[in-house]
Amino acid sequence: MSEGEIVQVIGPVIDVKFPIDKNLPNINNALRVIKSENESIVLEVTVELGDGVLRTIAMESTDGLRRGMKVEDTGGPISVPVGEDTLGRVFNVLGQPIDGGPAFSKDHPRESIHKEAPKYEDLTTSREILETGIKVIDLLEPYVRGGKVGLFGGAGVGKTTIIQELIHNIAQEHGGISVFTGVGERTREGNDLYFEMKASGVLSKTAMVFGQMNEPPGARMRVALTGLTLAEYFRDVEGQDVLLFIDNIFRFTQAGSEVSALLGRMPSAVGYQPTLATEMGQLQERITSTKKGSITSIQAVYVPADDYTDPAPSTTFAHLDATTNLERSLVEQGIYPAVDPLESSSSALDPEVVGKEHYEVATRVQHVLQRYHELQDIISVLGMDELSDEEKLIVARARKVQFFLSQNFFVAEQFTGVPGSYVPIKETIKGFKLILDGHLDDLPEDSFRGVGPIEDVLKKAQEMGVTPSDPEAKALLEK
């Protein structure tokens, strides 16, 4: 193995010179800087500058590094432990356990984090809907098993809360293997999630990988690949259906932009790296379903300053099967989850996939909400009195639909004190159909807010002293 020395340290970027007469390490190879007998730092080769000098990115803090320190080539890319033993464990970007448990032996099976995407002929598609138990998602932007989903939203609109609720609902119902990857997010949230999953018994079927906010950009750039490598092993070698949660995919792009200028690349739009689309494509094309198994991925995507035209979120859009857009104006109204029902979309909202009844109810919901959206300008200027009776009815039903799209989450119970609810798709469709058909016109709006199935609305209305006059609603209440 060839040996070189550090010639320059620029923050997280290190230049290393190797003898020209020996084989230079390949791009993406891992290099090791020996700081002391027990301590070393891993670098990854990114650019060859010429004259035997390689520009590398550090995966750990570069404190204490200086010119002249010896660097050795490991002979290959960063490789991480894979297999059943990774379940129930927490790793960093290098595949080292950070949960206080035993380390993995050197002869344990390992895989490189850099791989080619599966070949075109090996791919497969699924038309099976993945039930989440969240009404707004199941009705208007259903997720496909083996598909890619993006949760888009600005700061503090509830992306991580929805991801945690999906982990709670799907991982427990799904019963299969899950991989959670924390990319550049808060360490506290990762810590909370770990103990929550441990308490609920899901941890034994979950591998967790973290490269959080305090990590150098190199770790945040590569940690998504580490999590994906674990998921790929379960898909390709064990033939499993895997759930891959990534929070937050924007931080992967952000880390790349942090080091892009230091690597000598010319910045592109808004200061992002010119290789943004390529890097995103290389990651996303590996997250797919093959004939051996599937990876269903749910990715949170931070939207800087709520601007969806920003290159980072807009590059991510192209790779997704379904998008769940979170809207700040709904947060301000206290509607949680704050999912925008008109902006969110899914390729699976098709009568051939979800069925005729589901499709019709979903399009009717979108139509009534769109009509309400159009009437809001008139209402804000002239008031409700200027609307026709038909328009007043549309507004009343639309507001009930909007409130009924909200629900309480299991993971938020410790903050709200209200138990969460899991609503099956059939119950969701039944509830919205009753509202749209006018069976619940005489119930107060507030009875629809933050409830589970439609039966909860009727009970809440009864507690408010209102009994429905409609025979169908009465029959439901008597049940």
Curated annotation (Swiss-Prot):
Keyword terms, alphabetized: ATP synthesis, ATP-binding, Cell membrane, CF(1), Hydrogen ion transport, Ion transport, Membrane, Nucleotide-binding, Translocase, Transport
CDD domains tied to this protein: ATP-synt_F1_beta_C (cd18110), ATP-synt_F1_beta_N (cd18115), F1-ATPase_beta_CD (cd01133)
Reaction catalysed by this enzyme: ATP + H2O + 4 H(+)(in) = ADP + phosphate + 5 H(+)(out)
Presence of the UniProt keyword DNA repair in the record: no
Function text: Produces ATP from ADP in the presence of a proton gradient across the membrane. The catalytic sites are hosted primarily by the beta subunits.
Membrane topology reported for the UniProt record: Peripheral membrane protein
Complex formation: F-type ATPases have 2 components, CF(1) - the catalytic core - and CF(0) - the membrane proton channel. CF(1) has five subunits: alpha(3), beta(3), gamma(1), delta(1), epsilon(1). CF(0) has three main subunits: a(1), b(2) and c(9-12). The alpha and beta chains form an alternating ring which encloses part of the gamma chain. CF(1) is attached to CF(0) by a central stalk formed by the gamma and epsilon chains, while a peripheral stalk is formed by the delta and b chains.
Stated name of the protein: ATP synthase subunit beta
Similarity annotation: Belongs to the ATPase alpha/beta chains family.
Presence of the UniProt keyword Plastid in the record: no
GO cellular component assignments: plasma membrane; proton-transporting ATP synthase complex
Residues the entry annotates as binding ATP: 153-160
NCBIfam families (UniProt xref): atpD
Pfam hit, one: ATP-synt_VA_C
PROSITE patterns according to UniProt: ATPASE_ALPHA_BETA
Domain of life: Bacteria
A GO molecular function held by the record: ATP hydrolysis activity
Enzyme class, UniProt record, top EC level: translocase
